[in-house]
């Protein structure tokens, strides 16, 4: 039980964003954070990660971050994937059609940017440049340059646009003119250099609802921590939503 806003709240789970939240500016989980995670779990509070990264890439990094064995559940790819350690259940939903992804890329083809599709712990890009190298290094995830015509014969979880921070406003402005008569999509800025497209049914809240059902936990019984636009919905819908400030 914790005391917030004049009432006691029975917290059953903590769901934490990774980049800019769980990880320090050096890209690690600090010993103090690990200690607090252990104390929470000793009280029966579950720990989950809710992130734009794909589940597979997160799982490969848990040991490096020093939290292997401390995570109970993962909401990945912005809510399109879930993995529950207790039941060993994995689920993916609402991918983007390959034809839609191609049309999005065409919409931005004259701009200074690159693209990435995260899948199976790998970032797949249509070309090799400083942008995909930067993202792969920052996320500690390998990347491969592939033929998107072949890759996009099947639906994919989401599309990431990578750009310079100073070009993000141009990317956002260009997004306002994208339209597809055949497919629906939503998009948002997820970092200073990342802009993402996904199915409009995908959100961290939707992923949380799906995975919390397995533990009979309501959204109002969790605390969330996040720092970016894709954390906004879970911050609003959680029992307590904590917004991380950048100093």
Task: Name what the model sees in each region.
Residues 48, 75, 223-225, 242:
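Hydrophobic/aromatic beta-strand patches that form the interior of the parallel beta-sheet core
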